[in-house]
């Protein structure tokens, strides 16, 4: 009886071992094939296409199940009725929201534009022309330079302080850059020694008396038009001035009865001060827009819709206390009304030192993807004289350029990378460097995007590019603060914002760190998402708050929430956050409500990991078109029960929306598989069981474990 029961048990086990794989194979595999067949969208004339994007970066995002206007892409692993469109609009919006440090719309504010358009009458009304000739071809800079020079001369300290604070070129050097008219007219003290032979080369004026209309009148004579006959007549001049400025001078006016210059008097000073008080805010606002990449072409102000997407990295060497070294690395993409890139630039500026810098600009040649570019390598000392060492030009393909840029540019290099990959989180984040290569800093990669037939001397061009790459490499060797660092200042839509992001570079897909800092009225708001892990302790940025992300339409912040501040601040601001320990919906949106001010902050973030796609593809880790999935295992045959059951678990992870802690689930399942197989391998190694029986029993155990996981979902 026992023998027959034992045989019956073995028969049941074998039967289940044969049937279950067919069930899992039939139930899961066809669904998977239907789910992950993506339609290739044509992108002719639209810029980067789907293949380019997939090759550009590896990312995975939670899906906004409740679609919002700020959601620009979806997770292909989740069921949705939305079409997958990989076009320029989608791609640029993603870059703008995920990486950019600012967006500037290329349109000046109406008040400042009115100053430009009405300048002919304004300069007379406010008597600006008595002090300085503001040139319209360089209107913004010339106007700021005049206001600063006037403020310094007439001790308008609040005005000069605001300009130093907001205008980059005055932060390092506080000296006025232009002379006022009265400073350009130098009084000649020793009249007898005036060099009359330079009258044709320089401008002299003399104040003298003439008999006119039966009375003596004081007049100004321009010696180029009315030179004195000899030195004998010089004694008849009350005063002689020499023009020391640039350009054609404007003769001052005098009182015909006294001979005194009436320009620059107290009344005229008052009128100019009125203009400065009226215009300073608009002028500085416009300057900020231009500093962030906006156009100063006021002759063509109707470029409605054009904008500049800015990727700005500012570094400061704080170790050099006496002479703080500062460098700015900036990329700007200019986009037209059709959301197509029409031009762009990359620039490394080293300020207050003589390190080499470079500028690389490009512009669309027509409707295609061919762009002309120009580059130069230069140095400057104290932001004054520029010295160019090398210059080059050529053409490249924009799509390939963006692909190379964003595929290889953002590659964090962690010191404890292996530990991070194993555990899926960073308890103490420590890394040697974060490599941000705007050109991928590999000459071979950059040469791949060039249209080489347009390069006359390829060898010389390679040499020039290598020089630029070395400069850029030195920049990132010396400095650590990049987009991945905290406290990155940027100016967006009228207020200062700080933004930092730490991304993972391991097998785990979901990053667990996000940092955001903003100024709300007088309150400094800081949001963190770190799952109670210590956050960037190297520089001691403080404790970590655990805020939640949510995508539900019925999101109620009063549920499972806490107050950011207690006591009086709680009553004043009413700022709440949702507790992450009790609510783990998704990783897309977090909200912060300022209830007392009847205002709400809602920031959207895309949860993604960044990989170097070239390394992944070369290693064969993620085949093309399956970059978003946990990869399926290819069974050796219908009898490969382990592969079928593993594929069933992978299907759950890849397909079902709302899987809680999907990364931990995937990690946990993998560890269980590893543990179970290890356990039975040791047993069967000792007892030498039949391999077929070993496989069957193992897979039944795995199926039981799998069902346990399913019940937890």
Swiss-Prot record:
Q: Print the keywords alphabetically.
A: Host membrane, Membrane, Transmembrane, Transmembrane helix
Any Pfam family: DUF3688
What species does this protein belong to? Spiroplasma virus SpV1-C74 (SpV1)
InterPro entries on file? Phage_1-C74_Orf1
* Record localization: Host membrane
What is the recorded membrane topology of this protein?
Single-pass membrane protein
GO CC term (a single one)? membrane
| Protein name (record) | Uncharacterized protein ORF1
